[in-house]
From Swiss-Prot:
<dbReference type="InterPro" id="IPR000763">
    <property type="entry name" value="Catalase_peroxidase"/>
</dbReference>
<keyword id="KW-0376">Hydrogen peroxide</keyword>
<dbReference type="InterPro" id="IPR019794">
    <property type="entry name" value="Peroxidases_AS"/>
</dbReference>
<protein>
    <recommendedName>
        <fullName>Catalase-peroxidase</fullName>
        <ecNumber>1.11.1.21</ecNumber>
    </recommendedName>
</protein>
<comment type="subunit">
    <text>Homodimer or homotetramer.</text>
</comment>
<keyword id="KW-0479">Metal-binding</keyword>
<keyword id="KW-0560">Oxidoreductase</keyword>
<feature type="cross-link" description="Tryptophyl-tyrosyl-methioninium (Trp-Tyr) (with M-274)">
    <location>
        <begin position="126"/>
        <end position="248"/>
    </location>
</feature>
<feature type="signal peptide">
    <location>
        <begin position="1"/>
        <end position="26"/>
    </location>
</feature>
<feature type="site" description="Transition state stabilizer">
    <location>
        <position position="123"/>
    </location>
</feature>
<dbReference type="Pfam" id="PF00141">
    <property type="entry name" value="peroxidase"/>
</dbReference>
<feature type="active site" description="Proton acceptor">
    <location>
        <position position="127"/>
    </location>
</feature>
<feature type="cross-link" description="Tryptophyl-tyrosyl-methioninium (Tyr-Met) (with W-126)">
    <location>
        <begin position="248"/>
        <end position="274"/>
    </location>
</feature>
<dbReference type="GO" id="GO:0070301">
    <property type="term" value="P:cellular response to hydrogen peroxide"/>
</dbReference>
<comment type="function">
    <text>Bifunctional enzyme with both catalase and broad-spectrum peroxidase activity.</text>
</comment>
<comment type="similarity">
    <text>Belongs to the peroxidase family. Peroxidase/catalase subfamily.</text>
</comment>
<keyword id="KW-0575">Peroxidase</keyword>
Length: 756
């Protein structure tokens, strides 16, 4: 290069080359660029060579990534792996024995409090399951999401990285036969049993995830921030926790204010959104806080390093390195609170309730500066043994959240009752713990193993097995014929079948066609289901069912099956009218639930306030835009982008909109299964513009200006969004008419069978 002028472009190329060929320089630069304050959000500075998503440049672009996550290609076991079969091959007694042995084998790199990892594992289990929330069914123990960001780096999960590492020998031994998500829950059960508690049961069957869930955990951009309540103090839907990075509530009190009654309000909200009533809430808190201690030996900001997600590569996924004292044992720091609740932290007792109700409590601070409480009675200030230093004793402690259970009148009544009746208390905690750790597993058929308790709980949405259909091919043909002669239109049958099946959500495997709860309260009265039409169609189908069952002997048809069959017959009729012969796959065997088997309050949380597939949107109750809610619903139905696309187009052609609205019905042949929606949406002779009605668009003839169609944003997004348009074009091809019908039927059948 000597004697030549080096321009800026050449210089830049040289610098890039140096980075490529000098790993030390490249790593140093990468490290510098990745370093940011603990818990900080992105600063806006672009990381070198990092591609940017379209949402980076255009934040309002619809994000379709929820429909592409958890791809089977991410699973190292492959699509054909049968986890249920693998789990059932385990010797569960031996697995539990291995965990039990591990509990008291204290490791030098992370010594056990009181010589027992039991309380530590209980916290791990609780925090894994406790992310579950009822409003959208997301969170929970399933998938083992505690292993991944952001949960593995939440402040409330500090040190739980070590708990999972302690369990690694057990996981390594049993491999694919024992998922992390099952192991994390089982470890909590074994810990309880080790410390003298009789658990209610355990069910395996949780499949592991291989990547983080895309979940909205709150609006905040900093950990421990709280900006999720409206002016009336109501927690934003669908959230359950009060702060970013916490499982439930701030233990020091609302936004750090030591107000027990205010804390009680937050606790009631948070636990109710986790499907727990007051009795279950108190049992869980009291039972959980019977064991172990809190850790706040020093101020976190002075001692703790970065959380796992921000720690250096050499940390190998561990975080919160503690540079103070030993870095563990009596120098351990997690929440910043310090101390144990009871005098026997590794035994099942009623001491938590006794301490809470017996003593008056005075406010103090932990060594880390966190607000907590100790008894005013100094005689018990040396009652609690130190977790690591022999001969050292402390006072029992309570948090503001604990005192909420004493000062809230309703919680106190329950606490006093439990203290007076230890067996009632034990059973209440056992059942609440079982519910906590199994709430996101769906119906009882998903529960595996010898320790599954007999019977069904109401929260498992039971269905009467005796009502399951046992139909022959001839029976199905006979029923289809009766349905076709009933006078029910294609649209009516399609709407009812969709309403029944589309209540399903994969997040906690609730809802769906099985059980025919579309005929029961509260589902039959949901606005989205058009109650008047639903009642009419159900009445007709009930008559067909009664007539068939009268002479069918043991081959009875359930209402659940008949609803799905009515939808299938409607599709076959609509396809035939469009010129296609289709046999819609139908597999009987669904049963019917009773009203007594249906918790109305619990099922009310499944109500759809937006269903883009029916072009329904309730602006007063939806927390996202119509198009975002469409993607959210498609995600809950486990749909891919093409499946979502073909279903919307087909349902519009079938005239299946809410209350028969014509928005997006871009066809002159409504009620037939055709691809007109895509053909007409992409037709350049149509000019789309906003109408005078908010959320409604008008399609005008580009030449004459005459109105042709109306549509919503959910319809137009398939022509506007580049990714969706690419798929829509496929279904608009002249050569894709058969493909459209086949793909629609396949996606429809998938939705009908999601809960099976």
């Amino acid at each position: 290069m000597k004697g030549k002028t080096v321009n800026k472009q050449t210089l830049a190329a040289l610098v890039s080359a140096l980075l490529v060929f000098n790993p030390a320089v490249a790593d140093e630069q990468e490290s510098a660029q990745m370093t940011k304050p603990k818990g900080a959000a992105a600063t806006g500075t672009a990381k070198a060579f990092q591609p940017k998503s379209k949402q980076f440049w255009w934040p309002d672009q619809l994000d379709l990534s929820p429909l592409r996550d958890h791809d089977s290609r991410s699973n190292p076991y492959g699509e054909s792996f049968d986890y249920a079969k693998a789990f059932n091959s385990l010797d569960l007694d031996q697995v539990k024995a291995d965990i039990d042995q591990l509990l008291t084998q204290s490791q030098d790199w992370w010594p056990a409090d009181y010589g027992n990892y039991g309380p530590f594992f209980i916290r791990m289990t609780w925090h894994s399951a406790g992310t579950y929330r009822t409003l959208d069914g997301r969170g929970g123990a399933g998938g083992g999401q505690q292993r991944f960001e952001p949960l593995n780096s939440w402040p409330d999960n500090a040190s739980l990285d070590k708990a999972r590492r302690l369990l690694w020998p057990v996981k390594q031994k049993y491999g694919e036969a024992l998922s992390w998500s099952d192991l994390i829950v089982l470890a909590g059960n074994v810990a309880l049993e080790n410390m003298g508690f009789k658990t209610f049961g355990f069910a395996g069957g949780r499949n592991d995830d291989w990547e983080p869930d895309m979940v909205y955990w709150g609006p905040e951009v900093e950990m421990l921030a709280s900006d999720r309540e409206d002016r009336d103090g109501k927690l934003q839907r669908p959230l359950g926790a009060t702060h970013m990075g916490l499982i439930y509530v701030n233990p020091e009190g609302p936004k750090g204010v030591p107000d027990p009654l205010g804390s009680a309000k937050n606790i009631r909200t948070a636990f109710s959104r986790m499907a727990m009533n007051d009795e279950e809430t108190l049992a869980l808190i009291a039972g959980g806080h019977t064991f172990g201690k809190m850790h706040g030996a020093h101020k976190p900001k002075d001692c703790l390093g970065a959380e796992p997600a921000a720690a250096g590569i050499e940390a190998q996924g561990l975080g919160w390195h503690n540079k103070c004292g030993k870095g563990h044992s009596e120098d351990t720091i997690t929440s910043g609170l310090e101390g144990a609740w009871t005098q026997a932290p590794t035994k099942w007792t009623s001491l938590y309730l006794s301490n809470l109700l017996t003593y008056d409590w005075q406010q103090t601070r932990s060594p880390a500066g966190a607000i907590q409480w100790i008894p005013t009675d100094e005689s018990v200030h040396k009652a609690v043994p130190d977790a690591h230093v022999k001969g050292k004793f402390h006072a029992p402690v309570m948090t503001t959240a604990d005192l909420a259970l004493k000062y809230d009148p309703e919680y106190r009544k329950i606490a006093e009752r439990f203290l007076a009746d230890p067996e009632e208390y034990r059973l209440a905690f056992a059942k609440a713990w079982y519910k906590l750790t199994h709430r996101d597993m769906g119906p009882a058929r998903n529960f595996l193993g010898k320790e599954v308790p007999q019977g069904n709980f109401i929260w498992q949405d039971p269905i009467d097995d005796k009502t399951q259909s046992r139909l022959s091919a001839g029976d199905i043909k006979q029923l289809k014929k009766a349905i076709s002669k009933s006078g029910l239109s294609v649209a009516e049958r399609v709407r009812l079948a969709w309403a029944s099946a589309a209540s399903y959500r994969q997040s906690d495997m609730r809802g769906g066609a099985n059980g025919a709860r579309i005929a029961l309260a509260p589902q039959k009265d949901w606005t989205v289901n058009n109650p008047a039409e639903t009642a009419k169609v159900l009445k007709t189908l009930e008559a067909i069912r009664a007539d068939f069952n009268k002479g069918a002997g043991k081959r009875q048809v359930s209402l659940a099956d008949l609803i799905v069959l009515a939808g299938a017959s409607a599709l076959e009729q609509a396809a035939k009218q469009a010129g296609f012969e289709v046999a819609v796959p139908f597999t009987p065997g669904r049963g019917d639930a009773t009203q007594a088997q249906t918790d109305e309050n619990s099922f009310s949380l499944l109500e759809l306030h937006a269903d883009g597939f029916r072009n329904y949107f309730d602006v007063n109750h939806s927390y996202k835009s119509p198009t975002e809610m469409l993607v959210d619903k498609a995600d809950q139905l486990d749909l891919t982008v093409p499946e979502m696309t073909v279903l919307v187009g087909g349902l519009r052609a079938l005239d299946a909109n809410y209350q028969g609205a014509k928005h997006g019905v871009l066809t002159q042949r409504p009620g037939t299964l055709n691809n007109d929606f895509f053909v007409n949406l992409l037709d350049m002779s149509t000019l789309w513009q906003k109408s005078d009605v908010d959320g409604i668009y008008q399609g005008l003839d580009r030449s004459s200006g005459k109105p042709k169609w109306t549509a919503t944003s959910v319809d137009l997004i398939f022509g506007s969004n580049s990714e969706l348009r690419a798929v829509a074009e496929v279904y608009a091809f002249d050569t894709s008419k058969q493909k459209f019908v086949d793909d629609f039927v396949a996606a429809w059948v998938k939705v009908m069978n999601l809960d099976r």
